[in-house]
Amino acid sequence: MGPESQTVYADDLGQAVHSAHLAWQFDPLSTSDVSGQVATRTIGPVRVSWLDLMTGPSGWRGRRTFSDIRSVPEPYLIFCMPICNSIYLTSESGNFDIAEFTCGIWDSTQLLEFELKAGRYEQI
């Protein structure tokens, strides 16, 4: 059985990303220009997700708030590895530019912000 995959556009993007990467609040202006595919597969206690997105000229931004964190009380470790472009993460412990083929790790109990540059972004 293959992973669940869906093509997403601005209006459906939040739900697709929430199912793959927990709850986030997205910048409405930059979200309106984002489209792509999200695929998720659960293997036992592990959820593997793939994103292939095209952002608009201003990139794409979002953040996890206290409300988002409380919506899923069980803590998770999240591994992200960009394979096209990079992701910039900001947390209470610092700022991190996760480059292509570099693994970033964060836990779901952290306040976190992300920013993608304009263009294509792909991650597993």
Give the ranges of each region predicted by the language model.
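N-terminal functional module of multi-domain proteins
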Residues: 2-122
